[in-house]
């Protein structure tokens, strides 16, 4: 018998669901390795991410169930359960690392933007023709003008980069705060979900106990009705030998015919 099943059937059920997801993740990443199309890779990564999210939620349920049973278990059992939970977390983290790796590779493969575009051949020929018709002073003036334009473009670029960095910093801080808030909300929702599942199981247990009590009461009622019926039959027909007397229930014997004796003085 599985040691976790011996501790709690609910723990064993959660472990089975987690193992099913781990098998699906293993097969999914093997399939992803063979996919060459970027769009199909992206869809496959989304499906695997959803499975990892479900697995994380189940591991949280597993941890809560361990804590709820901790006081009733011995030290070796608690150590075994905690080791199993840590093994689950480690395996899930390995799949998360794989997902990040494939996501990074996919982003790199999709990036096809050239940072610098070289001048076209016709434009280069036009510049050569213009330069051949200009004097040295004009060429120097033109060069200085182009350098000034380049310096101004660099300054504008620096300002844009600095503004982008500032916006990125503010956005990062806002996203961090929102992420922490969402994490707290998710934890609260997981706790509520776990409590609802426990309450549902408790209601089912109470329902089964009530049904059992009703069956026992019905059986006792039938016994009482049977005893009353036997007593009535014995009273109505006391000479019926087919019905035995009920132990502990005495019936008065039928009155014998008595004769009145008269004393004559």
UniProtKB/Swiss-Prot annotation:
Coiled-coil intervals: 30-75
Membrane topology: Single-pass type IV membrane protein
Gene3D superfamilies: 1.20.5.110
One annotated Gene Ontology cellular component of this protein: SNARE complex
Domain t-SNARE coiled-coil homology: 144-206
Pfam families, A to Z: Sec20 (PF03908)
Cytoplasmic compartment residues: 1-215
Location in the cell: Membrane
Main location, first listed in the record: membrane
GO BP terms, alphabetized: cytokinesis by cell plate formation; protein transport
Quaternary structure (record): Interacts with KNOLLE to form a t-SNARE complex. Does not interact with SYP21, VTI12 or VPS45.
Cited PANTHER family: NOVEL PLANT SNARE 11, VESICLE TRANSPORT V-SNARE PROTEIN VTI1-RELATED
Function: t-SNARE involved in diverse vesicle trafficking and membrane fusion processes, including cell plate formation.
Name used for this protein in its record: Novel plant SNARE 11
Organism encoding this protein: Arabidopsis thaliana (Mouse-ear cress)
Gene field: NPSN11
């Amino acid at each position: 018998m599985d040691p976790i099943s011996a501790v709690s059937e609910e723990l064993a059920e959660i472990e089975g669901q987690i193992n099913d997801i781990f098998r699906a993740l293993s097969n999914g990443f093997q399939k992803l390795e063979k996919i060459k199309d970027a769009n199909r890779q992206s869809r496959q990564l989304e499906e695997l991410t959803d499975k990892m999210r479900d697995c994380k939620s189940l591991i949280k349920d597993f941890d809560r169930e361990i804590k709820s049973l901790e006081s009733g278990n011995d030290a070796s059992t608690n150590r075994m359960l905690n080791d199993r939970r840590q093994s689950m977390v480690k395996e899930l983290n390995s799949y998360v690392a794989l997902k990040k790796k494939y996501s990074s590779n996919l982003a790199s493969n999709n990036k096809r933007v050239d940072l610098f575009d070289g001048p076209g051949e016709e434009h280069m020929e036009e510049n050569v023709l213009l330069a051949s018709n200009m004097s040295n002073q004009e060429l120097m003036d033109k060069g200085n003008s182009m350098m000034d334009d380049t310096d101004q473009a660099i300054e504008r670029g620096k300002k844009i980069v600095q503004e982008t960095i500032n916006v990125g910093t503010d956005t990062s801080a806002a996203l961090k705060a929102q992420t922490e808030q969402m994490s707290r909300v998710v934890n609260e929702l997981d706790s509520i979900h776990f409590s609802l599942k426990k309450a549902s199981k408790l209601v089912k247990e109470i329902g089964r106990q009530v049904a059992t009590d009703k069956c026992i009461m019905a059986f006792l009622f039938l016994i009482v009705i049977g005893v009353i019926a036997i007593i009535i039959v014995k009273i109505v027909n006391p000479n019926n030998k087919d019905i035995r007397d009920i132990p502990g229930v005495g019936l008065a014997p039928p009155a014998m015919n008595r004769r009145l004796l008269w004393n004559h003085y």
